Amino acid sequence: MEPSEKKPIITVKNLTQRFGDNTVFEDVSFEVYKGEVLVIVGGSGCGKSTLLKIMIGLQKPYSGQILYQGMDITRASDEELNDYRQNIGVLFQSSALFSSMTIKENIALPLTEYTDLDPETINNIINMKLGMVNLAGYENHNPSELSGGMKKRAGIARAMALDPRVLFLDELSAGLDPITAVELDELIINTNEALGTTMVIVSHELESIYKIAHRVLMLDKEARGMIAEGKPLELKEHTTDPRVKSFFLRQLPAQHGEQRLYVN
């Protein structure tokens, strides 16, 4: 379900990130609309994960702004950043579950840190979130007892514990088998449609991108910035930029009149 009205919940303005003499990207500007699934794509080293970390507030940019409902998180105080992080959920590639804690204890962390809810209410929320990701009954398992896909779903349950307005996901399907990846795509779609959660996702999995994305932003390492924005199928069918075409068609430039498939 696409957002019914284009109201930006996050605005990125003229964002530049540099590490010493290395410019990762510069002058990147876009908006994240309320209720949409926005997928950030691009080749290795283009700055996808760096951009995500800046948007989360884990990294400071060289210059530029990221506005969340008018507050610039790049210049926010610790207290303001704390308030912002209560409105977002994050899942990195590794799922980042604490191995020494049960799944229940992992999901309880943000609830005990950011709320004054009583233990019974917290327990009810945990059970509800586990049910949402089809992990009911696994609350007392340790992460080591779960498959890769189950760990990702447990990570999503923890990221959703505080009912965030924005969910950030980094390479959700990386390293998973096709069936598990499809199940996670369905979970993303159902969560977005049922709760209206805005999502910002870094991905390179084409099948997943076509299925879940309302809109795509493409970064390019050589261009040091954003080179395309739009619906994934429209970019695939109508782009004239060879860099965008090579990504969405998974092709290398033809040599000697032959078309060559790109292998990830």
Model-based region annotation:
Residues 71-72, 119-138:
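Conserved ABC ATPase "signature" region
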Residues 167-170:
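Catalytic Walker B motif of ABC-type/P-loop ATPase nucleotide-binding domains
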Residues 56:
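Helix-to-loop junction immediately C-terminal to a conserved catalytic motif
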Residues 142-146, 150:
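Conserved ABC ATPase signature
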Residues 41-43:
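The feature captures the beta-strand-to-loop junction immediately N-terminal to the Walker
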Residues 64-72:
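Conserved ABC transporter NBD signature motif
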Residues 161-165:
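A short, proline-enriched helix->beta-strand linker immediately N-terminal to the Walker B motif
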